[in-house]
Amino acid sequence: MMPKGLFLALANAADGANHDDFNQWYDDVHAKEVLSLPGVKACTRYKLAGTQMLEGDGAGQQYLAVYEVEVDDWADFQTEMMNAFGEGRLTVNPDVLQMDPVPTTMMFEEVTPRVEA
């Protein structure tokens, strides 16, 4: 069985962009492109809640995409993703996606299996 993990992408809508347009592009175009990559199994998107644990908490980005991934090698996944950008299989739309600063991305390896209440 392949190791499981998460690929996280934190992003903002571009300055002056309509958030509905941003979300439509992200859901209908970008997330589907990422889901087409080998090993990407699912995606759930979130918006930063208005209340945080501590005043001022937040990563600076309003939106989070959580991709569930099963890969043997994270370096291969990163290479595949960069190749997909270079080949146009993964796209960005600077009209709706803030590119300065660029979205924050992180890859996490599973430490323990899912535990439920």
Predicted regions and their residues:
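Macromolecular interaction modules
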Residues: 1-117
